[in-house]
Amino acid sequence: MKVWMAILISILCWQSSAWAVCPAWSPARAQEEISRLQQQIKQWDDDYWKEGKSEVEDGVYDQLSARLTQWQRCFGNETRDVMMPPLNGAVMHPVAHTGVRKMADKNALSLWMRERSDLWVQPKVDGVAVTLVYRDGKLNKAISRGNGLKGEDWTQKVRLISAVPQTVSGPLANSTLQGEIFLKRKGHIQQQMGGINARAKVAGLMMRQGNSDTLNSLAVFVWAWPDGPHLMTDRLKDLATAGFTLTQTYTRAVKNADEVAHVRNEWWKAKLPFVTDGVVVRAAKEPESRHWLPGQAEWLVAWKYQPVAQVAEVKAIQFAVGKSGKISVVASLAPVMLDDKKIQRVNIGSVRRWQEWDIAPGDQILVSLAGQGIPRIDDVVWRGAERTKPTPPENRFNSLTCYFASDVCQEQFISRLVWLGSKQVLGLDGIGEAGWRALHQTHRFEHIFSWLLLTPEQLQNTPGIAKSKSAQLWHQFNLARQQPFTRWVMAMGIPLTRAALNASDERSWSQLLFSTEQFWQQLPGTGSGRARQVIEWKENAQIKKLGSWLSAQQITGFEP
C-alpha cells in the first residue's frame, strides 16, 4: 500500500510540475483560448485520421494537446482526451488496446518495478498501432487502433506490406497480435535524428488510396500476444519463428530501473531500424485478454525520451542594451527542461528579428538547444487570442554612449561592467551581472571604473553581496590594477581586436592618443573604416575623461 501511495504521489508531483501554473485569465478569455486551440487540434485530428496527412510535427501536436488538457483542468472545462481518434472505426478488436501509462522519471519507474517480477524492456516504436488477427495460419484481419475497442479495417493495406507475415503456423496459427506499424529506417539514431514525424508519415501511407508500392517502406513490431505462451522466452521464440524477428531482437530482461536506464540510453544512441520515442517496460505475466480495456493496463508502463524540442509559453518580452549600444530582445519563458537544462530565457536577437518572429507574451514557441547547449527558437507554434507586445526602447545608444551612469543608460552601463569584468578583459572572478547591479544600486557608480574606489567596508555592507565573498571581491579589484595596459584599453571599448591591439605595440595612453589614422589602418584586420572608428573613439570626450581618471589612479600605462 505504501509503495502504491508513493507511486501516486510521484505521479501527482510530476503532473503538477508538468501542468505548471494556471494562466491568469478571465473566464471569457479562458473560454476563447481553449476554444481556439481545441478547434485547431480537431482540425489536425481530422487531417491525421481521415486524410492521413499532418500539418504539424508529432512532438508539437503532443505538447499542445497536453497544454490544452492543462487549460481545461485549470478552468473546469475538461472534455474527452483530444488525442483520442474519431470514433469512425466499425471493426471490433478481438482484444482491446489498453494503451500505456507513462512514467515521469526513473524514480517513478523504480517504484512501479519494485512490486513486480519477470520484467522486460522493449523500444517504444513510433508509428501507428494495429491488431493482426491470424486464423488457420493466414492473416485474417488487420485493424487500426481506433479508440482501443473499434478501429478501421486495414486488412487490404497490411496485406500489401511485405514485411508482415501473411501466413504463420504452430502456436500463432490462430492468434491475435498487437503491434506498431512503423517506417523502416536504416541506422536511425534517435539522439541525432529525432522523430522525423514518423507517426504522421505512417498514418499518411495507411490512409491514402492507391499507394501499394510505398507500403513496402513499412514494417511491424509486435509488442503484445494476448493469451500467448506464459514464458516471455517462448513468446519471443515463437514470434521470431513466424517472421516477427524484431520483437526477439529488441526485448530484454531487466531487474531494476538502472538496467532499464542503461538500455534506454543505449537505444537512444544506437543505430536502429525504426524511430523510437522511449522504452516500454512490461511484466511477462498478463491478465487474460478478456480483461483488457483501454487505459486499464497495470502490467506495462512507458518511459519516454525527453523531447529534443519543447513547447514553452512566453511569459514576457524583455529588451537588453549591449555594451555597443545594440538592443537585443529576450523572451522569458515558463520553465522547460531540455537535455537536463532548465530553460527560462531564450535570445530572440535584434528588434527587427523579434518583429519578424511576431512573438508576444502568451504565445507558445518551440525551443531546442543549439551548439554548446544554447537555447534557440525553432518556431512559433501557437499565438494567443489576446496579444500585447511591449514597445522597444528608442535606439539612441551606440558604441560611444553610457560610459558614465545615468537613468537612461542603465542597461548599457551594466553591460559595459559585465564586459570589463570578463575573463578576456580584466578577469574579475566571482562577479557577474547580478553582482554589478547590486554594487551600482548601492554605491551609485559615476562611471565604469568607479568600483576601483570601493573599500572593504563598502563591499561588506553591500546588499546582495555575501560578506564571505566581499573580501575576495576587493582582492580581485586590487589585482586588476596590475593588468596590462592593453586590457584596460579593451575595458574602455576600443574598437579593435586583441590581436590588432597587441600588434600596435602601444604601451601608454599618451602614445595611443597621438597615433594617427594611417597607423591604425596598417594593423592586421583593420581597414580604413575601423581605423576611423578608433580615431572617433579616442577623441570622444567620455573616453578622454576616463583616461584622465585612470591616470590619477596610477593605472599601468596611464601614468602622467
From Swiss-Prot:
SS bond partners: none
Function: Catalyzes the formation of phosphodiester linkages between 5'-phosphoryl and 3'-hydroxyl groups in double-stranded DNA using NAD as a coenzyme and as the energy source for the reaction.
PROSITE patterns assigned to the protein according to its UniProt record, in alphabetical order: DNA_LIGASE_N1, DNA_LIGASE_N2
One function term, GO molecular function aspect: DNA ligase (NAD+) activity
Record family assignment: Belongs to the NAD-dependent DNA ligase family. LigB subfamily.
Keyword Nucleotidyltransferase: no
Keyword Magnesium: no
The protein's Enzyme Commission number: 6.5.1.2
Pfam families given in the database record: DNA_ligase_aden, DNA_ligase_OB
Chemical reaction(s) catalysed: NAD(+) + (deoxyribonucleotide)n-3'-hydroxyl + 5'-phospho-(deoxyribonucleotide)m = (deoxyribonucleotide)n+m + AMP + beta-nicotinamide D-nucleotide
Entries under HAMAP family matching the protein: DNA_ligase_B
GO BP term (any one): DNA repair
Organism: Escherichia coli O6:H1 (strain CFT073 / ATCC 700928 / UPEC)
Name of the molecule in the record: DNA ligase B
Domain of life: Bacteria
Catalytic center residues: 124
Keywords: DNA damage, DNA repair, DNA replication, Ligase, NAD
